[in-house]
Amino acid sequence: MAQFDTEYQRLEASYSDSPPGEEDLLVHVAEGSKSPWHHIENLDLFFSRVYNLHQKNGFTCMLIGEIFELMQFLFVVAFTTFLVSCVDYDILFANKMVNHSLHPTEPVKVTLPDAFLPAQVCSARIQENGSLITILVIAGVFWIHRLIKFIYNICCYWEIHSFYLHALRIPMSALPYCTWQEVQARIVQTQKEHQICIHKRELTELDIYHRILRFQNYMVALVNKSLLPLRFRLPGLGEVVFFTRGLKYNFELILFWGPGSLFLNEWSLKAEYKRGGQRLELAQRLSNRILWIGIANFLLCPLILIWQILYAFFSYAEVLKREPGALGARCWSLYGRCYLRHFNELEHELQSRLNRGYKPASKYMNCFLSPLLTLLAKNGAFFAGSILAVLIALTIYDEDVLAVEHVLTTVTLLGVTVTVCRSFIPDQHMVFCPEQLLRVILAHIHYMPDHWQGNAHRSQTRDEFAQLFQYKAVFILEELLSPIVTPLILIFCLRPRALEIIDFFRNFTVEVVGVGDTCSFAQMDVRQHGHPQWLSGGQTEASVYQQAEDGKTELSLMHFAITNPGWQPPRESTAFLGFLKEQVQRDGAAAGLAQGGLLPENALFTSIQSLQSESEPLSLIANVVAGSSCRGPPLSRDLQGSRHRADVASALRSFSPLQPGQAPQGRVPSTMTGSGVDARTASSGSSVWEGQLQSLVLSEYASTEMSLHALYMHQLHKQQTQAEPERHVWHRRESDESGESAPEEGGEGARAPQPIPRSASYPCATPRPGAPETTALHGGFQRRYGGITDPGTVPRAPSHFSRLPLGGWAEDGQPASRHPEPVPEEGSEDELPPQVHKV
């Protein structure tokens, strides 16, 4: 069988996209002709700052935003200290009388300054409070640290400001109206003039994405392979997901950039983590480091908790007063953002997708309001509203009613109660259609567990989707609990997985020429990490351990190819995209639809287009989703799936390339199958504004094309899964740190095969019945990168596997040996050089 405990790999030209003969090129430029941006050493940080400056709309906006962040921190600390030590609450609450008049019988008005203590008294109370002094000292040190960091960042971003002006020739006034694709295209062109990277003559879009998203790609892969402890089963609550900003910060601190982390710098993994000889020692070292960071979090817990409470209060108090139903609104959870993120997807691209899916996601969750809760909310709103109406009427009649004690408080609380109750009352005109809503959501978020399809009306699906799309109040509560829960997760949940994390970084890290060490999943190579049930059958050599779950490799490749049409993918990826295009053409032709229109006219689609104020691409998605349910008599689920697949394929076939200067009218431009020129960066006419407008419109059509491809690929995957019910999904178990091999079959320690869950991110304990495996979609496709010599890798059909201690797999019915050749665990660093893969 194949050897899955691979060593660190160095990949060259196939991923660097360098011209032939320039793989190891080192460009030399005469000293006098060097530009200020020649040979930038830390390109990761440089490209990240270029991207951040673009997202923050220029240097001035970024500078003012940073200044306000410093002032905001200073205000929170100073204002809290003032409220604690400098206010006489007895006067404020009228428990103590203040008389400014010489005649005691005269009425007295208490002003706000009367409740403020004198400066001397305030200072004395602060000095007497030792706990407050300690907190102020720590806050002052932290603020000075942020101030120094702010000054340093301003100096660095001024250099980026000059880079935009002189190298990219983009003025700051025009930067907010330039898309990232336009900036990226100019960076690629600037490389030819200034040689930003001396290891390559030309930069590609993938090189830039790799440097900006190096650590983010690792995080997406860790979540995809379920290696981070994010799911917990609690008594009375069932399975919950806990992933907060504080926990994510600690993960990144431990793994990527903190002292003693796995990385030597931003672009290079430490040499000892690239070899398998010291894996147990490295795992123990990582475990100890996690323990100490967990203890540090525990000691700092009171301070962090106080800051979280104060920041949440000052941030959301005004919002809650102005819009009491805001906490009843929903937002995408941090886990959802990581689970739904493609490999090599920038933050603004992810945010754009999630924003498009917000409305249908909200409508879907509103379909599941409890009838009992709705009944209670209606009656609660009636009683609270009645009392509120009487108080408001009395106030209108005589405003002195507000002077009565607690009247204003009662009015405020009753108003909040009415608003909260209304948020639990559904719209009386709403139609319950969860399946169509879930399909629209899938068109935008692109990822969804298999067992959700066809079960959108079930409460289990709703509860699992709520882990991705949670209440804003739940998000705030998790952030408040994070300082308490994070140390427990680090010490008791993350430490036992130290060995698996060490193996993950060794097995899934490759060195790309001109880029450095990157996550191998970020290469989007269907041969290395494709899944046979996601159109990669016959094209992938990946084991179950190496496969990305939920079609992450295939969908990420499609997304990147559509977003960056000028990018030239490797040979296997090109073959995959070509095969998908052929499949779309076949299914679209089989649909028997007219070439002039996307779908036949139907009443539901006409009403959707007449009632919606959406853009044309979103109306197209609504057309595709609604089309298959509006034509003909009711069909079985399989026939409905085939019809839906044909509808999507027909919509994709209708896409035609948009020529420069042609306005998009009724046609969607093809960005994946075009000539390789990014039409979104082309300007039509002499006006810059026209070019920018066309760029935005074409970007919208590109996102629509990706949405249709996501629907189409999920439908193909569903049909293939039904033909082959047993899906082979890698799911982790606790590491065997002893390093012993798995028991032989028939031995005392032999175990029955564990049930395979349907989704690594949403595990299900119910196993599927076995079935014969289907043939490959693209049989006979066994091409590999020329020049790769890996005799240990043998392509074979998927079969049942049992887990090995190192994360490898053995076929059922065979002895479960851990390695074809045992890897020594100590003292073998010199005998185990990294395996170099030449391309």
Curated annotation (Swiss-Prot):
Catalytic activity as recorded in UniProt: a 1,2-diacyl-sn-glycero-3-phosphocholine(in) = a 1,2-diacyl-sn-glycero-3-phosphocholine(out); a 1,2-diacyl-sn-glycero-3-phospho-L-serine(in) = a 1,2-diacyl-sn-glycero-3-phospho-L-serine(out); a 1,2-diacyl-sn-glycero-3-phosphoethanolamine(in) = a 1,2-diacyl-sn-glycero-3-phosphoethanolamine(out)
The chain's Cytoplasmic topological domains, given as residue ranges, are 2-61, 155-290, 302-319, 329-371, 425-470, 481-483, 493-839
Phosphoserine PTM positions:
S14, S16, S18, S656, S735, S738, S741, S828
Where is there biased composition of kind Acidic residues? 737-747, 823-832
Q: Please list the residues annotated as glycosylated.
A: N99
Provide the species name: Rattus norvegicus
Q: Which Pfam families does UniProt cross-reference here?
A: ATG9 (PF04109)
Q: Which GO terms describe its biological process?
A: autophagosome assembly; autophagy; bone morphogenesis; innate immune response; mitophagy; negative regulation of interferon-beta production; negative regulation of macrophage cytokine production; piecemeal microautophagy of the nucleus
Basic and acidic residues bias locations: 724-736
Residues with the modification N-acetylalanine, per the entry, are A2
Protein task: Phospholipid scramblase involved in autophagy by mediating autophagosomal membrane expansion. Cycles between the preautophagosomal structure/phagophore assembly site (PAS) and the cytoplasmic vesicle pool and supplies membrane for the growing autophagosome. Lipid scramblase activity plays a key role in preautophagosomal structure/phagophore assembly by distributing the phospholipids that arrive through ATG2 (ATG2A or ATG2B) from the cytoplasmic to the luminal leaflet of the bilayer, thereby driving autophagosomal membrane expansion.
- Intramembrane stretches: 291-301, 320-328, 471-480, 484-492
Q: What is this entry's stated membrane topology?
A: Multi-pass membrane protein
Domain annotation text? Forms a homotrimer with a solvated central pore, which is connected laterally to the cytosol through the cavity within each protomer. Acts as a lipid scramblase that uses its central pore to function: the central pore opens laterally to accommodate lipid headgroups, thereby enabling lipid flipping and redistribution of lipids added to the outer leaflet of ATG9A-containing vesicles, thereby enabling growth into autophagosomes. The tyrosine-based sorting signal motif, also named YXX-psi motif, promotes interaction with the AP-4 complex.
User: In which compartments does the protein localize?
Assistant: Preautophagosomal structure membrane; Cytoplasmic vesicle, Autophagosome membrane; Golgi apparatus, trans-Golgi network membrane; Late endosome membrane
User: Which lineage ranks, top first, belong to the organism behind this chain?
Assistant: Eukaryota, Metazoa, Chordata, Craniata, Vertebrata
Modification after translation (UniProt): Ufmylated in a DDRGK1 dependent manner.
Q: Name one GO molecular function term.
A: phospholipid scramblase activity
Q: Which residues cross the membrane?
A: 62-84, 129-154, 372-397, 407-424
Name of the protein this chain belongs to:
Autophagy-related protein 9A
Motif Tyrosine-based sorting signal, chain ranges: 8-11
Family to which the UniProt record says this protein belongs: Belongs to the ATG9 family.
* Keyword annotations of the record: Acetylation, Autophagy, Cytoplasmic vesicle, Endoplasmic reticulum, Endosome, Glycoprotein, Golgi apparatus, Lipid transport, Membrane, Mitochondrion, Phosphoprotein, Transmembrane, Transmembrane helix, Transport, Ubl conjugation
Per the record, ranges on the Lumenal side are 85-128, 398-406
Record-level GO cellular component terms: autophagosome; cytoplasm; endoplasmic reticulum membrane; endosome; Golgi apparatus; Golgi membrane; late endosome; late endosome membrane
Q: Oligomeric state and partners? A: Homotrimer; forms a homotrimer with a central pore that forms a path between the two membrane leaflets. Interacts (via cytoplasmic its C-terminus) with ATG2A. Interacts with SUPT20H. Interacts (via the tyrosine-based sorting signal motif) with AP4M1; promoting association with the AP-4 complex. Interacts with ARFIP1 and ARFIP2. Interacts with PI4K2A and PI4KB. Interacts with ATG4A; the interaction is direct and promotes ATG9A trafficking.
* Coiled-coil residue spans: none
**Signal sequence region:** none
